[in-house]
């Protein structure tokens, strides 16, 4: 949808772009989208072009932070190669912009072929499958006790 939109139509904030750390938070951007849609009369009142323009504007603001902070972190930690991976690597504009920024700054850059971009959950599931295949007598996986709210322990 964002590919069909005008990324400049709705100027949106790029949260934490100028913070000195390398953290990300898109809560301000999400709130800006919420208010924008509300001010335009609600989602059901938006035509397809406006939806595409909002998506493109959101993508533009989000990627600006992601690309900028990635390059700054690579410089700061003296990284030689930037690797784009995980589900986010399927975003065509991110692939283009991060590759260009890395080249301009003199970093080696790598990303998977588009057909290999996938959600992190799929990668974790595949790793679990291979681990189970390597050691099938590791127990009955159907009797696992799963706690989705398990906290981290020291």
What are these regions (language model features)?
Residues 82, 99-124:
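Conserved phosphate-binding/catalytic loops in two-lobed NTP-binding clefts
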């Amino acid at each position: 949808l964002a590919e069909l939109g005008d990324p400049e139509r709705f100027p949106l904030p790029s949260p934490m772009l100028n913070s000195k750390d390398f953290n990300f938070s898109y809560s301000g951007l999400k709130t800006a989208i919420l208010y924008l849609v509300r001010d335009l009369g609600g989602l059901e009142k938006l035509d397809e072009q406006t939806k595409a323009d909002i998506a493109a504007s959101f993508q533009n603001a989000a990627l600006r932070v992601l690309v900028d902070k990635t390059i700054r972190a690579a410089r700061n930690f003296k990284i030689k190669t930037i690797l784009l991976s995980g589900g986010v690597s399927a975003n065509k504009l991110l692939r283009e912009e991060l590759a260009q920024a890395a080249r301009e700054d003199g970093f080696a850059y790598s990303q998977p072929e588009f057909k290999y971009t996938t959600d992190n959950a799929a990668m974790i599931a595949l790793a679990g499958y291979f681990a189970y295949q390597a050691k099938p007598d590791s127990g009955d996986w159907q009797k696992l006790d799963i706690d989705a709210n398990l906290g981290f322990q020291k």
